[in-house]
């Protein structure tokens, strides 16, 4: 564009120079014509003036010739300048085309660079979004890992606690098993004593059937026997209540160590009550033996009274046997429940007790091996004098 502007300026300048030369030549030619015309019109022009005029004309001719030469030179120069201008114009146009092509190429390059930049910017933004998403996933994974580690620690603590509780439970199970074995031995002894008591009562019935005591003495003996029977029944009822209490306490769920200790104490207390009931039964049997002796001393009853007394004694003995049989069934059932409890796995702490199931063993409990054995009573039969 600059080259084009300069070329146009040169062309304008050359045009102005050519126009000036042409106007100057025309002015000089006009002056010569005017002088000749003036001479021709004035016939009185002096010779000197004419000569001067001729010289001037010659001079003007020379000048005109020189001006023509200059004009040709100027025209040639102008033509050269025009050629140069055309050449410069062509070069400028070529350069302009080249520049335009260069500018188009530059524009295309800039467009390509802009496109690449936009593409890279989009890729960078996509990578940033992807990185943010990955970071979010990573944060979520870290949170999940932390939660799992916390859960693992909690489970490890729970397993450790369960392991300790299992050790305590195993120790308490062993202790309670020993106590249960001792309790079974005690129940066997109770059953044996009850069997002896039944045999003694049968013997008393036989002795009463053959006694010839007097009515008054027999009535006293009968009242005493009934009282003794009531005491025995009371003792058996206490024994039944204590055994029921033991069963109910066995049905309590896997409780704490203190609860198991209380249950064990209650079982021991029940055993003491059983021993006490046996002692009372022994004392009542001793009273019956004393009554039998008194019956032997008084033999004044009639056959009818003997039959009535025998019927009453048989009825009472039958009722007592039924009660003893029922008590034996309950003891057998209790033994079966305890045997099944010893085979079942320990319940977890905090669960409710299921009826009919035994309690979990208590840690630290000791078997009743050091307890004093049940007092073995010796009784002498009044009829034969045999000691049992």
Swiss-Prot record:
D repeats lie at residues 311-316, 317-322, 325-330, 332-337. Residues 147-161 are annotated as: 2 X tandem repeats, type b. The keyword Electron transport does not apply. A- repeats lie at residues 91-103, 104-116. GO terms for biological process: plasminogen activation. Residues 91-116 are annotated as: 2 X approximate tandem repeats, type a. It is found in: Secreted, Cell wall. Disulfide bonds: none annotated. C repeats lie at residues 160-194, 202-236, 244-278. Residues 85-113 are annotated as: Able to bind plasminogen. GO terms for cellular component: extracellular region. Residues 95-189, 204-231, 248-269, 331-388 are annotated as: Disordered. Residues 1-29 form the signal peptide. Changing residue 111 to A: 2-fold decrease in plasminogen binding. Pfam families: VEK-30. InterPro entries: Plasminogen_ligand_VEK-30 (IPR021965), SMCR (IPR049896), SMDRR (IPR049895), YSIRK_signal_dom (IPR005877). Binds to human plasminogen (and plasmin) via its kringle repeats. Also binds to albumin, immunoglobulin G and fibrinogen. Could provide the bacteria with a mechanism for invasion, as streptococcal-bound plasmin could permit tissue penetration. This is Plasminogen-binding group A streptococcal M-like protein PAM. It comes from Streptococcus pyogenes.
């Amino acid at each position: 564009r600059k080259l084009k502007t300069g070329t146009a300026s040169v062309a304008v300048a050359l045009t102005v120079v050519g126009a000036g030369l042409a106007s100057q030549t025309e002015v000089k030619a006009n002056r010569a014509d005017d002088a000749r015309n003036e001479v021709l019109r004035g016939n009185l022009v002096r010779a000197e003036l004419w000569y001067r005029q001729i010289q001037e004309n010659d001079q003007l001719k020379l000048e005109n010739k020189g001006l023509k030469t200059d004009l040709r030179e100027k025209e040639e120069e102008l033509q050269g300048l025009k050629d140069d201008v055309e050449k410069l114009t062509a070069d400028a146009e070529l350069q302009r085309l080249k520049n335009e092509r260069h500018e188009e190429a530059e524009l295309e390059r800039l467009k390509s660079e802009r496109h690449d930049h936009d593409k890279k910017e989009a890729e960078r933004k996509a990578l940033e979004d992807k990185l943010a998403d990955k970071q979010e996933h990573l944060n979520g994974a870290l949170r999940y890992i932390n939660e799992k580690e916390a859960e693992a620690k909690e489970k490890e603590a729970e397993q450790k606690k369960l392991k300790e509780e299992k050790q305590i439970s195993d120790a308490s199970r062993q202790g309670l098993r020993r106590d249960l074995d001792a309790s079974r031995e005690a129940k066997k002894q109770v059953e044996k004593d009850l069997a002896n008591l039944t045999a003694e009562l049968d013997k008393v019935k036989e002795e009463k059937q053959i006694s010839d005591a007097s009515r008054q003495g027999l009535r006293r003996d009968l009242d005493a026997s009934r009282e003794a029977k009531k005491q025995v029944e009371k003792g058996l009822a206490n024994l039944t209540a204590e055994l029921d209490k033991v069963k109910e306490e066995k049905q309590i769920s896997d409780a704490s160590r203190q609860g198991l200790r209380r249950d064990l104490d209650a079982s021991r207390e029940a055993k003491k009550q059983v021993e006490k009931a046996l002692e009372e039964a022994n004392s009542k049997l001793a009273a019956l033996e004393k009554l039998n002796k008194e019956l032997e001393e008084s033999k004044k009853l009639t056959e009818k009274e003997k039959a009535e007394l025998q019927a009453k004694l048989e009825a009472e003995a039958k009722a007592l046997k039924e009660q003893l049989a029922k008590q034996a069934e309950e003891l057998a059932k209790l033994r079966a429940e305890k045997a099944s409890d010893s085979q079942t796995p320990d319940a977890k702490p905090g669960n409710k007790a299921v009826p009919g199931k035994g309690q979990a063993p208590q840690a630290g409990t000791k078997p009743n091996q050091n307890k004093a054995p049940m007092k073995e009573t010796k009784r002498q039969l009044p009829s034969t004098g045999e000691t049992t």
